[in-house]
């Protein structure tokens, strides 16, 4: 644990050390309005919900501008990527203002808002707003590698899984009732699946590469108190990927309920097989994208239907991604008591259940 993280995590938030450091940040990045603030006038509170970083809201009893301190847990490479992404979105008004960055984190604008919950993203009107917001982000050109990352991360995860001693993986889900999966699968067979799905994706959708969030769960969406506008946050996992993968990741995550009982997740089969907002979500996306590009389409319904098929094609791939990633995490010593392997089995069961649909879409679109 590095010094800044250790300071804020290892001490009481009303300790002299924490309050003084927060005051120093205010003076360093916001200048005069914080220079006359006394340490006794500063309050630091933790913002809950950050999975890959610690977040703290810093205020004072004066009129000085409040701010958020975001202290990263990741390595330097991912931290640098997140800073670049955040700065670009901030400049375009698609996120909080960036006040400054420092080793291990950044200081940003505090946006009075609420974080969406799972039930919120299942609401049709909110789902439409999310669909309409996506193209604003997908339209941005970000100066990072344009190579698609999802399948490469799967391969890297399986390589690490094998290096940690992992072998053939038994599939016996305890929550979902899908039965199309094999009883077990080898690393070799998983890599074959990855290669095949990557080929299908390239054949069909190579012209849809955009900058993707890759993890837009409800907890990564803010709704501003002032306007009701939605803001996507936490871009540390962002990279270029296929558009449909990004959309399917968001939609598929809306069917995943996280809890404290083993295996830690419940994947809702009805929401997986018959997502209620898919049509409305895709309609809003197409309408927003056309407006951004200045297009007047004569066949909106065709565009919407194509996007729906695109999302359905990538849907099982998101579950394959999480299965491979979680298989690796499950072998880390610190995770052994969490039983992450059980979650990987659930995701693999969903993958094999939906895989045939992706194959049908591939064959149909390949004929056209």
Curated annotation (Swiss-Prot):
Biological processes annotated in GO: CDP-choline pathway; phosphatidylethanolamine biosynthetic process
EC number: 2.7.1.32
Annotated GO MF terms: ATP binding; choline kinase activity; ethanolamine kinase activity
UniProt key word Cell division: no
Top-level EC class: transferase
Reactions catalysed, as given in the entry: choline + ATP = phosphocholine + ADP + H(+)
Recorded coiled-coil stretches: none
Keywords associated with the record: ATP-binding, Kinase, Lipid biosynthesis, Lipid metabolism, Magnesium, Nucleotide-binding, Phospholipid biosynthesis, Phospholipid metabolism, Transferase
InterPro entries documented for this protein: Kinase-like_dom_sf
Cofactors, names only: Mg(2+)
GO cellular component, one term: cytoplasm
Family under the similarity heading: Belongs to the choline/ethanolamine kinase family.
Name under which the protein is recorded: Putative choline kinase B3
Origin species: Caenorhabditis elegans
